[in-house]
Amino acid sequence: MKFFIELNKFRLIIVFIVCTSLIGCETINTFVKKRNLEVNTYMNKTIYLNPSEDKTVYIQVKNTSNREINGIKTKISSILKSKGYLITYYPEEANYWIQANILRIEQIKLENKDNLLHHCLEQYLDDIHHTPGLCNKENEEENNFIEKISKSFFENNNFIVVTDLQISQRTNILCSKFDRFHLNSKEKIKNVINPKSKEGKRNFYKTRIYSYANKVNLEFYEAKKEIENQISHSISEVF
């Protein structure tokens, strides 16, 4: 029976090569392009702060997502210190407050299940299952074998990280704090005064940061460091 298993694996590789040649260069080029990690980060609205000689900053970073990401505060502190800012642990002493929350980290798998190669592999697997004389254990081995091949080529994984950011700056002018509310399913946003908000001498600026990581068979830990670097850079460059 072992001979049949090895023979089937050899035949599967031949089918794989033939199907790949039928697909052409486009799929191969796509795989080659996605073999390296690619991370992009952008802020959906620019924040402009007033110039000030007071360079004290209070930093608060939270993570309410379902994944661990904990190096952002340290990186922001390091970058701002290199720019001449003083980091304080007491918010009442700070001219600037940086308040960030990692709101959501989600994985999206882009699997090309409709392409010719995937169809060929599935069809061949179906033929193997109907080969006389092979027991269930052997079928499981074939299943694992084809699953490894399919996953290695067709799981183009993406991670999306959403970060809410609020930066405030002390001012001599008494101002009211505005809150943002979602009005409908299209997520139109309107500024309305929250009756519970207190007037104070601070200007508040809100925005959102989006980070995208992409690579074939990407695991989050592979992209974590670069995502932290880019989010930290994006926030620090406001100053």
Curated annotation (Swiss-Prot):
Q: Where is the lipid attached (N-palmitoyl cysteine)?
A: 25
Q: Can you list the GO cellular component terms from the UniProt entry?
A: outer membrane; plasma membrane
Residues of the signal peptide: 1-24
Lipid-anchored residues (S-diacylglycerol cysteine): 25
Q: Where in the cell is it found?
A: Cell membrane
Q: Gene name on record?
A: traT
UniProt keywords, alphabetically: Cell membrane, Conjugation, Lipoprotein, Membrane, Palmitate, Plasmid, Signal
- This chain belongs to the protein called TraT complement resistance protein
Keyword check for Glycoprotein: no
Cross-referenced Pfam families: TraT (PF05818)
Q: According to Swiss-Prot or TrEMBL, what is its membrane topology?
A: Lipid-anchor
What InterPro entries does this protein map onto? TraT_complement-R
Q: Which organism is it from?
A: Wigglesworthia glossinidia brevipalpis
Q: What is its main location?
A: membrane
Q: Which domain of life is it from?
A: Bacteria
Record's keyword annotation contains Signal: yes
**What does it do?**
Responsible for preventing unproductive conjugation between bacteria carrying like plasmids.
